Structures are given as C-alpha cells and as structure tokens.
Amino acid sequence: EKEKELDVQNTTQALQDTLGPFVFKALQGYMLKYVPQKDEKIKGFIKTFTPIRFNRYSTGTMMREHYDHIHSLFDGQRKGIPILSILGVLNEDYEGGEFVFFGRHEVPLKAGDIMVFPSNFMYPHEVKEVTKGERYTFVAWAF
C-alpha cells in the first residue's frame, strides 16, 4: 500500500512577515542557550531562514525517518546549507503523529511549541502516522 503523502503549503509574504519574528525569537533563544556566545566566530552565525512551510498530516499520513541537511532546497533565491531546523506545532486535536528522534525518543509537543534542532545526519527524525484528525505544523530552516 502506498504511503499517504502530507499536504505541504508554502507561506505568503504577508504570513511570513507575521510569523517571521516569532521564528527568529525562537532561534535567538536557542542560540543564547546552546551556543557559546564568547566565541567571536559564532556571533552572526545564523544569517537568515527559509520561507515558512506549512505541513498538514491527515489521518493515515506520516513522514518516514530522515534528516534535514537538504542541499536542493537551498539552491534558489536564498543560497546556503541548513544549519538548524525549526518546527512549530499549531494544534493538538489529533491522535498519533508523534515526533520521534533516533527511532525511539518521542518529543512531547503541544500547540504553540517551537522546537529548534541541528539540520544534520546526527539528528534523524520522523513523524509517526496520524491515526485520527489532522496534525498541523510549520517548518523552516536557518542558515
């Protein structure tokens, strides 16, 4: 049986302008907490992030394990290789759809959470099948 594909929608400029500051604030918080600020080479490390993309996972939809070091997404107008992945959770009224790292570490996420993690092969992750309802998230990548 063929895997059901998730519905992906890119954002409009108006929505990007509205959500962008929240995403950037989450990035700044991550950088302050996890990156040594005294290292001069790190300052200004994150220059920008991609346009926000919305994902809808309907019942029966999942995303197989993968990692986000995706060169082909970043060969257009904004060039670069992703450094950080940004995931925002927009709702909770669904069942299943757990976010899992390394095939076994489930990350509990609720509506309004923004998770930031490295975009490289050391952080494989997946979204388990949604068994009831629809799961809505947004994603972006910083570089």
Question: Positions of the model-derived regions?
Answer:
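Fe(II)/2-oxoglutarate oxygenase catalytic core
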Residues: E1-I114, M122-F143
